[in-house]
Amino acid sequence: MIHLGVDTLCWHLRLEHGAVTLEDVLEQAASLGSDFVQVNLHHVREREIAELLTLAARADEIGLRLLVSGDFLGEGRNGDAPAVGVGRIHAWLERAVALGSSLLRVVSGFYRADLMGRPELIEAERRYVVSVLRGALPAVDAAGVALLLENHSDFTVDEYRSLVTEAGGSTGVFLDLINPIAALDDPEPVVRALAPLARAGHVKDYVFESIPTDDGYHRRGFAVRYRYPGEGVADLPRLVAALREGLGGRDFHLSVEGLDNHADVDDQRQRLAPALALLRSLVA
């Protein structure tokens, strides 16, 4: 069964500027009928453990589960030792447990486009991530938390398979249905291939925008702009169908990642409502 939720990244700039609180976000998510909120730990970085326990209790009162996202594991190519990433996971894990999360999403420290043409550096990052995941697994497994690496426009499908296999334990994939676009890949085969390894993930949408010359005679290139589900050109019915097929009936938590947010624009509720309605129709 696919459970639908929202990520606190939808409110990122408003949270950073103090326009809303995490408590406000939980109330909005509950009013939208979300099953859960994917909490990016960046948004609770200044809260003590006791405050996180209170936040988790409030979420439980209004019928929400909280799942947790950590951040970048480090950069092996720039000399980070695996202990750097392991230390980060241990710190995130304590906060994930306080929030009652059954999983911890993490990401590598690079984008493939930045290392294109440097396969030795990409392999260095792959080895680094494997070492970090292996080093963190004893504590993660002891806490009963699944450690999920997001497909973050970094590794290929085969590399993800090798990462999960070599790391072992509770390691899996946090599957973003749209991120393959950033690597100019068709997302459907990626979703189909990684779904069996995934337990949670993100969904968004995108549009392409031309970047014209000053006189408009030709374009300098194009940009990919992220949007809320249903606002762009992604074939979400096909992607959700591929996800469902790969899951084989397993539980999966899919959160809307609204990266198109602004500090002075309060539009999350009006954009999330139709996005969630669309997704509900696709997972029914």
Question: Locations of the language-model features?
Answer:
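Acidic-and-aromatic substrate-binding clefts and catalytic sites of carbohydrate-active enzymes
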Residues: 13-18, 39-51, 73-85, 114, ...
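Active-site acidic/histidine proton-transfer and metal-coordination neighborhood
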Residues: 60-66, 78-172
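A structural motif corresponding to the C-terminal end of an alpha-helix
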Residues: 31-33, 98-100, 132-147, 238-250, ...
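Non-membrane alpha-helical structural segments and their capping/turn regions in soluble enzymes
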Residues: 19, 23, 49, 53, ...
